[in-house]
Amino acid sequence: MLSETMPSEKLVKDFMRPLDQYHYVKEEETVQDVLQLMDKARQEGKPQCLIVVGGEPSEKEMIKGFVTPSDLVFGLMTHFLKGAEKSGPIFWEGQFEAECLDGMNKRAREIMTPIRAYVRESEMLMEAVFLLNKYQEDFLPAIGKEEVVGIIHIHDILTHMIRLASGKRGASEVRSVPFHK
């Protein structure tokens, strides 16, 4: 009787998005290029997370990290924000535009979030939740046998939680829904 009421355990592969739903950027591309690609992803309704790959021919399929909207905003302001923390209140006028323009020639590798963890696609969803929390990430690569086969995103987990709350327990398929971050 208890087994009839227990929901089946969901796996990472039930929620991950395949790699073809993401745009790729080479690690040596400029922030200006990255911003254009991020805008393209947004307009296409794709995840606003760019996959950063190596720039060398031998590394072109090696995933080095991700660039998210947070990486773009805070990555351009890194030295300024660190200085502001130490000195306290400062004069802000014109600072945002100046920092943005100064940072346009930075490289994707300078602002990306490197991959610090991954989860196997065959793991239970709770393992992904644990790792996302542990590393304070929103995205996590999902590994098949020996390579990255997809990416699980916290928004897709949240979508499932919302479905659970509304009584739609069986619906675990990931829909392509535009989201921010």
Pin down the residues of each PLM region.
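Tandem CBS (Cystathionine beta-synthase) repeat/Bateman regulatory domains
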Residues: 1-181
